[in-house]
Curated annotation (Swiss-Prot):
Belongs to the alanine racemase family. It holds the Pfam family Ala_racemase_C. This is Alanine racemase 1. It comes from the Bacteria. One of its GO terms (molecular function) is pyridoxal phosphate binding. One of its GO terms (cellular component) is cytosol. It is an enzyme of class 5 (isomerase). The active site is at residues 40, 268. CDD domains: PLPDE_III_AR (cd00430). SUPFAM superfamilies: Alanine racemase C-terminal domain-like (SSF50621), PLP-binding barrel (SSF51419).
Length: 388
């Protein structure tokens, strides 16, 4: 049956592939290094709650998310594993942080005092990880003398547990290994200074996906894999140390077919004109679903194992493909946007290259109006339609 009760445009998520990738990462870092699975951005478009449930079964040590809302969604779905919020949480939401045992990133003593005040109000202690900016220029302490002074003060706060300290590489996926080493040395020098003051922080972490593969010295107490959990490498310049498996297919189906003559215009702005008698198919996927408009007249999808070009501009909800050279196309035939069909593949990396971005952005821009259908070892185990 070509159509079922789920929207024709969908993402199939392979949870067994995600768990495989997780195990591959464990092989690299060894049993003494903890793993924080980074599942922000709805697990890079894969659906955070399902992914978290399966990684929790695999024994993941921590989850990393960007916002309070992402963390609360996981708690509401029954996730018990510790969750670190990488970003800023407004003071108005600190009650939720404490109530749901979430770990907050901190890089300011005034903020730490606000969090401690809320913790004591609830008769609890909130876990915090201190963020150090060693060269990314985003958030975190850049004055290391101030950092040391305030961290030592935080360590004595009754309402806080100073569990972790971390930083983030700016160029681990690039060729600038010297800058990575410079960042790492800054981070370790601060930690050494704190330890001389008799403060030993349990979880020290700096390694993202690229550093896991390229910079073994940076693994420390915990690593933070993100995109490699989801089957893609962070860049072409990282070592291919692991056998990553494809974790999703982004697909749709043909909903309209028409025969048109040569000289027929397709799409907004008349940006494509047929050069011969052609068969044009319409598929119900557009830029509101995550198919980038820059792929207009500039990319090929898969139909019956053959590459077919997008013709005309990608619309908000639909686009057109030229299927003239594919025999026997029918309404309901599957079209692959990202993934494999009949041993041919449209990779997330190739799409990212075409629009001059990274796989992380391509995955995370697949919108929530696209249902996620979940499989394990080829068996469908569930689906999520965010709009129901």
């Amino acid at each position: 049956m070509k159509f079922d009760g789920v929207r024709p445009t969908r993402v199939e998520v392979y949870l067994d592939a995600i768990t495989h990738n997780f195990r591959e990462i464990k092989k690299i870092v060894g049993k003494n290094v903890k793993i924080m699975a980074v599942i922000k951005g709805d697990a890079y478009g894969h659906g955070a709650s399902y992914v978290a449930k399966f990684l929790e079964k695999e024994g993941v040590d921590y989850f990393g998310v960007a916002t309070t809302e992402e963390a609360l969604e996981l708690r509401e779905k029954g996730i018990k594993t510790p969750i670190l919020i990488f970003g800023y949480t407004p003071p108005t939401q600190l009650r939720q942080i404490v109530k749901h045992d979430l770990t907050q990133t901190v890089y300011d003593i005034k903020y730490a005092k606000e969090l401690e005040k809320e913790s004591l109000k609830q008769n609890k202690r909130a876990k915090v990880h201190i963020k150090i900016d060693t060269g990314l220029g985003r958030i975190g302490y850049i004055d290391f003398d101030l950092a040391q002074k305030e961290i030592l003060e935080m360590a004595n706060m009754r309402g806080l547990i100073l569990e972790g300290i971390y930083s983030h590489f700016a160029a681990a996926s690039e060729d600038d290994r010297d800058y990575c080493k410079e960042q790492f040395d800054k981070f370790m020098n601060l930690i050494s200074s704190l330890e001389k003051k008799r403060l030993k922080i349990p979880l020290k972490h700096i390694a993202n996906a690229a550093a896991i593969l390229n910079l073994n010295y940076s693994h420390l107490d915990m690593v933070r894999p993100g995109i490699i959990l989801f089957g893609a490498y962070p860049s072409k310049r990282v070592e291919r140390k692991v056998e990553l498996r494809e974790t999703l297919r982004f697909t749709t189906r043909v909903v309209h077919l028409k025969d048109v003559p040569a000289g027929f215009f397709i799409g907004y702005g008349k940006s494509f004109v047929t050069k011969r008698k052609s068969v044009i198919a319409t598929i119900p996927v557009g830029y509101a679903d995550g198919l980038d408009r820059r792929l207009s007249n500039n990319y090929k999808l898969l139909l019956k194992g053959k590459y077919v070009p997008i013709v005309g501009r990608v619309c908000m909800d639909q686009c057109m493909i030229d299927v003239t050279d594919v025999e026997g196309v029918e309404i309901g035939d599957e079209v692959v946007i990202i993934g494999t069909q009949n041993n041919e593949t449209v990779s997330v990396e190739s799409m990212a290259d075409k629009i001059e971005t990274i796989p992380q952005e391509v995955f995370s821009r697949i919108s929530r109006r696209v249902p996620r259908v979940y499989f394990y070892d080829g068996i469908k185990i569930g689906e999520v339609n965010y709009l129901k």
